[in-house]
C-alpha cells in the first residue's frame, strides 16, 4: 500500500518565501501576536491579518470569501475560544461549538483555495487525564480527558484529526503543533480568569504596590508544571512550517519542570516582593505532574532558547508597561 500520510512531502521552502502571503488567524492573542512578531523579525513581508470585527471565523461564508479574495499561500491557525475551568463549565456549548466552527471553516477553505501548507495549533489539554508522564504524542485518545476542559479538548482533537484526514484524502500538507503551558507578553492578567503564572505575577505586584506583608497561594506548591515562553513557541512554529511535513502532531514544550513553589519564589524575586509567601494547604493542588515529551521536536533540530528566569523578567517588564501603566 502506498504511503499516503504525506511523510514524503517536501519541506524547507517556507524560509525561502519571504514575500509569500501568510494568513495568521488569531493575531491579537498571546500565541498569534508572538507568531506575527517572529515572522516580521525573520523578514516575512506579506502577512494577512484580520481582527474579529473584520473577519468572523465562525461564519463559513465570510471565511470562504476571505480565502477566495486574499488567496494566502500559508496559514497558521492560532485563533481559538479559550478560557479557564469556570468558563469551560459555564459555556461548554461555546467551547466545543465555536472552536469546531473556526477550525472547520479555516481548514476547509484553506484546502479548497490552494493553500500550500497549514499549521494548526492545539493545546496540551488534548491528552488523557492520566496520561503517562512525560506525555508522548502517542498518548492521544488512549483514555478519558480531564472533565474540566473536555469540551475545548475535544474540539482541538478534532482539529488534529481534520488535518490528518485532509492529508490522507487530499495529500494536503496540514500539520499540527501542541504547545505546553505558555506565558509572555499579551498574556491574560485578569484577576478572575488568568492562568497560574500571570495570576502569581499580578498578585505579587499588587502586594508589593500595597506594601502587603504576605501573599497567600493555594495548595502545597508541590505540583510540577512546565512553561514555555510564547516567543519560543513562535520560533518553533516557524521551524515546523519550514522543516516538518509529517502526519502526527508534534509536542512543543520546554522540557523543564518546575514546582509551583519554585515558580512562585521565582516570580516573587522577579517582581521584587519582599514579604512572606504563605501556602494554604487546605486548598486543592490539582494534577501532581504535567510535562510534555518534546523529544520528537528536539530530534528534528529545535530546542527552546529562553530560560524561565529571563522569560519571567521580560514578561514582568511588559506587564508594567502595558497593564499597570495603562490603568494609571
Swiss-Prot record:
The gene is GER2. The lineage of its organism: Eukaryota, Viridiplantae, Streptophyta, Embryophyta, Tracheophyta. NADP(+) binds at residues 26-32, 156, 179-182, 195. GO terms for biological process: 'de novo' GDP-L-fucose biosynthetic process. This is Putative GDP-L-fucose synthase 2. Coiled coil: none annotated. Catalyzes the two-step NADP-dependent conversion of GDP-4-dehydro-6-deoxy-D-mannose to GDP-fucose, involving an epimerase and a reductase reaction. Its EC number is 1.1.1.271. CDD domains: GDP_FS_SDR_e (cd05239). The active site is at 152 (proton donor/acceptor). Pathway: Nucleotide-sugar biosynthesis; GDP-L-fucose biosynthesis via de novo pathway; GDP-L-fucose from GDP-alpha-D-mannose: step 2/2. It catalyses: GDP-beta-L-fucose + NADP(+) = GDP-4-dehydro-alpha-D-rhamnose + NADPH + H(+). Homodimer. InterPro entries: Epimerase_deHydtase, GDP_fucose/colitose_synth, NAD(P)-bd_dom_sf. Belongs to the NAD(P)-dependent epimerase/dehydratase family. Fucose synthase subfamily. It is an enzyme of class 1 (oxidoreductase). Disulfide bonds: none annotated. Keywords: Acetylation, Isomerase, Multifunctional enzyme, NADP, Oxidoreductase. Substrate binds at residues 203, 218, 225, 285. The record marks 156 as: Lowers pKa of active site Tyr. One of its GO terms (molecular function) is GDP-L-fucose synthase activity. The modification N-acetylalanine is found at residue 2. The record marks 123, 125 as: Important for catalytic activity. Gene3D superfamilies: NAD(P)-binding Rossmann-like Domain (3.40.50.720), UDP-galactose 4-epimerase, domain 1 (3.90.25.10).
